[in-house]
């Protein structure tokens, strides 16, 4: 573990990954982090990791050993501590027969940074703990407004920005989860048609752990002038993770993924982006660069990256798309 002592000259230069001595985080190299695995067993196979990873994500079994087994152990300790606190509070309140509400893990980060892979890997590792907890995974994509509504609000070019989400529905969902309600429905989203699927839902029925993944899940909200109470999505999290990387790396991963999709998913006639499959490579590259510059880069700078310091754990990736550094918030 390393903690440097260099002092920044202005607040604007602050970067938690410069490892300032006064930082609220501990910083670890992957080698240091891997040692925290202890005796945590590897319960995934190479084939399973390949199946779980997203397009362009090179995560393999070695990366699971280096990063995810220690993370699994850390999360296990947090879940166990939460259970102990739950039991102590029940004794304090003289409550009997009360079920514990789900432990919610939030995963945030830019488009194309690898959030979905991390979420799927964690889900499989956590559900294979000796206690066999019930683990569900929900993404925020389903809480986007349907395209018709985005068009009505003139927000199609800001899809993925905070205002493009039905925040009220999202908060109702998380409130129901944390209230311990059964059969809570989350809307489904199709990346093929690039839209919310009407009348299609995923039912979440009182899991032990819920992983909630999305680009803006750590986003704070402006306090209203009328003084009304405004909850934030992260208020419902028991633990939060931010997947981080340099801006230029995410840019490259996004464009590379777009060009690969042009050769695969975009060729499906039902794809929203089918029109991009028949244009020239140069034209497609120009479109990908435009989408990055005009939408995703702006969202990263304005809304996503500023939420990074709110995470309990930050996984920072290098140019090979693998994690190179870990930051864990101090208690």
UniProtKB/Swiss-Prot annotation:
Record SUPFAM superfamilies: P-loop containing nucleoside triphosphate hydrolases
One GO MF term, please? ATP binding
Cell compartment(s), UniProt = Cytoplasm
Under the heading Pfam families, the entry gives:
PRK
Keywords from UniProt, A to Z, are:
ATP-binding, Coenzyme A biosynthesis, Cytoplasm, Kinase, Nucleotide-binding, Transferase
Q: What pathway, per the record?
A: Cofactor biosynthesis; coenzyme A biosynthesis; CoA from (R)-pantothenate: step 1/5
Tell me which Gene3D superfamilies the record gives: P-loop containing nucleotide triphosphate hydrolases (3.40.50.300)
Query: Which family is this sequence assigned to?
Result: Belongs to the prokaryotic pantothenate kinase family.
This one is known as Pantothenate kinase
Record EC number: 2.7.1.33
Q: Cellular component terms, GO, for this chain's entry?
A: cytoplasm
A biological-process GO annotation: coenzyme A biosynthetic process
Q: So what does this thing catalyse?
A: (R)-pantothenate + ATP = (R)-4'-phosphopantothenate + ADP + H(+)
**Sorted alphabetically, which InterPro entries does this protein's record hold?**
P-loop_NTPase, PanK, PRK/URK
Q: Which residues bind ATP?
A: 109-116
